[in-house]
Amino acid sequence: MFGSKIFSRLFFKRTYATYKRFDNTTSSSSFTTSYAHLLTNRKTLYIGGGLLGFYVYNLHDAPYTHRSRFIWVPYWLETKIGDYSYRQIYQQFQSQILPHSNPLYNRVSTIMNKLLDVALNDNINDDLNARFLNHLKSLKWEINIIQNDSLPPNAFILPNGKIFIFSSIMPICKNEDGLATVLSHELSHQLAQHSSEQLSKQPIYMVLSTILYTITGVSWFNDLLINGVLTMSASREMESEADHIGCELLARACFNPQESINFWHRMSQAEKKAAGIVSQEGGYLNTWEFFSTHPATSRRIADIQKWMPQLLQIRESSGCYEYGRFYNFNKSYFSH
């Protein structure tokens, strides 16, 4: 939900390179001729063919949704970046992290253990390839609850399995099903390798930015165009995908998917109050989605309502109404 923002701040303070503009006195005809020559050059064609082959070879289907996406970043690099992010964040909030003896830690770990058991279960999850599943199982999962109600409500999971939850989000979660909504969403970002997908696209965005700059000579316009048309759109798509996967996970783990709708209603009210944007009628205004990294909350609610019949069916077929479904659940992915 919010993890991608922190991830981006740490590694991509500026997504696109800034280029010095050289002599721009070339006529339009010479400009066109130069590009035509470049495009028909045999070496250029070889390089372009190789890059196209590399792109096609690294197209993979996302779990659950089966969306085709480009990912070339290896697991070890994704984990190393997660380690770097973890050290930065832990150093910043170390004094505010609750001890494992705190009741809230036990509450969060119980929910996460159920979600991880469903997500990493070989007999249940056939959407993840065996190699990636083993990679996820090898991670040292860890929960860090940051006690500071003055901070914005937030939660995220890094690619190395480190989980961060801000105490300010707990009143919005309200109950276990609401908390499961947040945690399953964040876990879904890692199951779908959204961090790797974002990293994989950065070179493409930089190349496009360079090409646009040679045409327009205006870097801010190029940034605006690429952000609005590509970057923001891709981010919203990944957020919606995490919503979808997360809802399926929590339904399989026997949480109530209908509470997800209530959670997003509460989140919507919290966001609007924090923004302080009030309409003339006394209500709150919606932000323009086009330049947002996240879908509008109303859209997220509508999506979950659309998925609800399927989610309830998944929950029923998971044996959630059988006595003792999690009664003997003792497996823990977290070391104390």
UniProtKB/Swiss-Prot annotation:
Sequence positions that bind Zn(2+): H185, H189, E239
Residue numbers on the Mitochondrial matrix membrane side: 17-154
Annotated active site: E186
Membrane topology: Single-pass membrane protein
Side of membrane Mitochondrial intermembrane, spans: 174-336
PANTHER family: METALLOENDOPEPTIDASE OMA1 (PTHR22726), METALLOENDOPEPTIDASE OMA1, MITOCHONDRIAL (PTHR22726:SF1)
Designated name of the protein: Mitochondrial metalloendopeptidase OMA1
Species the sequence originates in: Candida albicans (strain SC5314 / ATCC MYA-2876)
